[in-house]
Amino acid sequence: MKLDIGGEETFEVPIETLWSALNDPAVLKKCIPGCKDMIPEGGDRFKLILNLKVASVGGSFEGEISLANQQPPAQCKVAVSGSGTLGQGSGSATFSLEQQPAATLMRYSGEGEIGGLVAGVGQRILKGVAKHLIKQFFTSLRREVTAAPPAQS
């Protein structure tokens, strides 16, 4: 089952602060919903261990996240793949950052492919779950970057 995501978020921090947070495994571990561990595997690749609940079914997932096509501090592509008790999935998203007068605008777009038991809950429910998880990520990221000291230029 295919899922498409996209949107934009505004963060009231300088672009460098947001870029640093998006490239900090400790911050990402706190922000990725259900993330239990994020283990460096070399370069810009990390092993992920997640516990997620989809509809009324919960399970654990193990996978990989990698960063590519980085153009600091403006753009990055993220690729994710994994499998677990509920099925398997993979996807990628591109994030672009643009400095605004008093904030940073983040635009994102991506797509994912989900299979296995989790795909059986239906596309409408999965889209709702995906939107909820994305909202959780951005809420946590906003909390992390606004609590952080300003980035040094």
Predicted features along the sequence, with ranges:
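Hydrophobic ligand-binding cavity/cleft-lining segments
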Residues: 1-47, 51-53, 147-153
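Intrinsic-disorder/low-complexity, polar/charged segments enriched in Ser/Thr/Lys/Arg/Asp/Glu/Gln
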Residues: 2-8, 45-47, 60-62, 75, ...
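Hydrophobic/aromatic beta-strand elements that line small-molecule binding cavities or substrate pockets
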Residues: 7-9, 35-36, 62-69, 91-99
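A generic beta-sheet turn/junction motif
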Residues: 11, 52-56, 71, 84-86, ...
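Hydrophobic pocket/interface hotspot
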Residues: 18, 22, 28, 67, ...
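Glycine-rich portal/gate segments that line the openings of hydrophobic small-molecule binding cavities
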Residues: 39-81, 136
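Beta-strand/loop substructures that line and gate deep hydrophobic ligand-binding cavities in soluble
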Residues: 82-128
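A conserved amphipathic terminal alpha-helix motif
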Residues: 118-153
